[in-house]
C-alpha cells in the first residue's frame, strides 16, 4: 500500500469554521491517499467527500446499511432509518459541519464509490457511551460501509487506517464506534483493527431496539508502548 496523505480532517479544538471550510475546499488532489488493492480489484482513492458525491453516497448507504442489520429489523424499520439518516439534506450537512468528516473510497478507473465512512468528533454519536471510553477526547467512527462485492479487498482497512491518520492529526486519544452485537463479521474486523469492547448501548433502527457493542481503539497509550 502506498500511503502519502496530508490530513483532511482539520477540525481541532479552537479552530474556526472558516479555517476548516477553507482547508477542506482546497484542491482534493493534494489530500489523497492512494490504496493499491489486490487483483482483480482496481486501485481506489480514499478522499474527502464532495458535494457532487452526495447522490452516490445516498445510493451506497441504502445498499449497504441493511447488511449490518439482524433479522429482527424489518424492511419498514430499515426504510424509516435510511430516510432519516441518509437523506440528501442530512448528507450535505455533514460536509459543512465542523465536527464531521465524510470520506469516500472511489474506484480510480470507473469512479464508482466502493465505500464510505463518517467520522464524528467527541460525544455527539452517543454521549452516554462516550462517558465509558477509556481515552478522551475520542474520534467516533459513526459509519463505515463497503459494497458487498468488495468485502475482503482491503477497502474497509484502508478507510480505518485513514481514520487513524485523522485521529493523530487532530490530537485525539482514541477511536471509538458501536456495532450490532449480532454483526459477527464486523466485530471480527474491528478486533483485527485493534478495537476492544468497553461497553454496550441501545440503538433503535426505526421502532426496533438493537443491542450494540461499544468498542474503542486507544491510540496515544498504544503509541507509548
Feature map (PLM): residue ranges:
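C-terminal "cap" of GNAT-fold acetyltransferases
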Residues: 133-138, 173-176, 180-187, 191-193, ...
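Conserved N-terminal entry element of GNAT/NAT acetyltransferase domains
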Residues: 31-55, 221-225
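Active-site acidic-Proline motif in GNAT/NAT acetyltransferases
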Residues: 147-149, 153, 181-182
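Acidic, Ala/Val/Gly-enriched low-complexity intrinsically disordered segments
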Residues: 2-5, 15-23, 27, 35
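Acetyl-CoA-dependent GNAT
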Residues: 51-54, 58-71, 79-149, 157-162, ...
Amino acid at each position: 500500500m502506498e500511503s502519502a496523505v496530508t490530513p483532511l480532517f482539520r477540525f481541532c479544538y479552537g479552530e474556526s469554521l472558516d479555517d476548516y471550510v477553507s482547508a477542506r475546499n482546497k484542491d482534493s488532489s493534494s489530500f489523497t491517499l492512494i490504496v493499491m488493492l489486490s487483483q482483480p480489484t482496481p486501485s481506489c482513492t480514499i478522499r474527502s467527500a464532495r458535494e457532487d458525491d452526495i447522490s452516490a453516497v445516498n445510493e451506497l448507504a441504502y445498499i449497504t446499511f441493511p447488511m449490518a442489520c439482524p433479522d429482527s429489523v424489518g424492511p419498514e424499520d430499515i426504510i424509516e432509518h435510511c430516510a432519516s439518516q441518509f437523506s440528501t439534506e442530512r448528507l450535505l450537512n455533514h460536509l459543512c459541519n465542523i465536527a464531521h468528516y465524510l470520506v469516500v473510497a472511489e474506484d480510480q478507473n470507473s469512479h464508482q464509490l466502493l465505500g464510505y465512512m463518517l467520522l464524528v468528533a467527541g460525544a455527539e454519536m452517543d454521549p452516554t457511551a462516550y462517558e465509558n471510553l477509556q481515552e478522551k477526547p475520542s474520534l467516533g467512527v459513526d459509519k463505515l460501509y463497503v459494497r458487498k462485492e468488495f468485502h475482503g479487498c482491503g477497502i474497509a482497512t484502508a478507510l480505518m487506517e485513514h481514520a487513524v491518520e485523522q485521529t493523530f492529526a487532530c490530537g485525539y486519544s482514541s477511536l471509538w464506534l458501536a456495532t450490532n452485537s449480532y454483526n459477527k463479521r464486523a466485530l471480527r474486523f474491528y478486533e483485527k483493527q485493534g478495537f476492544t469492547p468497553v461497553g454496550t448501548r441501545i440503538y433503535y433502527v426505526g421502532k426496533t431496539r438493537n443491542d450494540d457493542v461499544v468498542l474503542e481503539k486507544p491510540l496515544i497509550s498504544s503509541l507509548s508502548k
